[in-house]
C-alpha cells in the first residue's frame, strides 16, 4: 500500500511540477514565498525506527534544500514573516528531542557546511541521561545528548532550543505550576547548562491539541521568541510569526519534495488550534512577575562564574561524503 501511495504521489508531483514552479516564482515576485521548517529527530545508521533517518538520507535532504531553496535560521524566518517580505522560497532545519547519535554525523556535517540549525532538547533527559519513554516502550532505550555535547554544538554555531524538561504532553497538563516547570524553569536550566540565551521552544508532539493558548502565553511571558508546532504546515506572509509551523523531514524523499514544492492542497486541511484555556484565566496573572524575572536568569548565572569547558573532540568526526 505504501509503495502504491508513493508511486501515485510521485506521478502527481511529476505532472504538477511546472505549475508548482510557476506558482512559486509568482509568490516570490510578490514577496510572499513560503518558508518550510523541517524537523528531524535522530540521524543514525543503526536501530532504525519511525523517527530515525539514515545519514545518507539526511545529507540528501539538506543538499536538495541547498540546491533548490535558501536555507535560513529560525530568526531570519521570523524576520521575513514580521516584515511581510519573503522574497525567496526558504527552508529551516530543526531537530527535536536530543539524541546522542546526532553528534556523530549530522551535527558535525551541518557545522562544517555552515548550515543554520536549531536543536531542541528536553532538559531533564539531558541532565540525567534518561532515555525517552517512547524508546523504552519500543524496547530500545537510545542514548540522549550530554551537556558537554550541547555546549560543543552551540560553540560550533548550532542554536540550542527548548523542548520542555520532561518531553511532556501538554494535552495532559492540568495546573499552571506544571506548565511553568516545563517551560519557564526548563528554559532557565537550559540557559545555565549551555551559557547561551534560549530563544525558541518546540512543543513535544506539536499537534493542535498540544498547542494550547496557555502554552503560547507562558512561553511569550518568559522571553521565548517563537513557539514551534509539528503538525505539518507552511509559514506564509500574514501568519503569526510567533507560531512557527513545521513539517516532518520525511525519509520518503518524494513526500519531502512534494511538501517543499508548495502543495496548495495542504492549505485546505490546516487544523484549527484551541482558542480557550482555563489555565490562562485562573493562574497566569498571579505568576506573571516570576515568569518575567527568570527570562534571562540562566544566562546571567552562568556568566557570573560557571565553567564553559568544551571538549572539541565531541564534534570531531570523519569526513562524510554526500
Where are these regions (language model features)?
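C-terminal active-site subregion of NodB/CE4 polysaccharide deacetylases
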Residues: 1-94, 101, 172-322
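Acidic (Asp/Glu)-rich catalytic clusters
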Residues: 32, 66, 108-115, 145-161
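Short loop/turn segments at strand-loop or loop-helix junctions that form parts
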Residues: 38-43, 122-123, 162-165
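Surface-exposed cleft-lining segments at the edges of enzyme active sites
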Residues: 47, 128-141, 167-176
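Generic enzyme active-site microenvironment
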Residues: 94-95, 161
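A short, conserved beta-to-alpha structural element at the edge of catalytic cores
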Residues: 114-135
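Histidine/lysine/aspartate-rich catalytic loop segments that bind and position anionic ligands
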Residues: 145-150, 154-181, 185
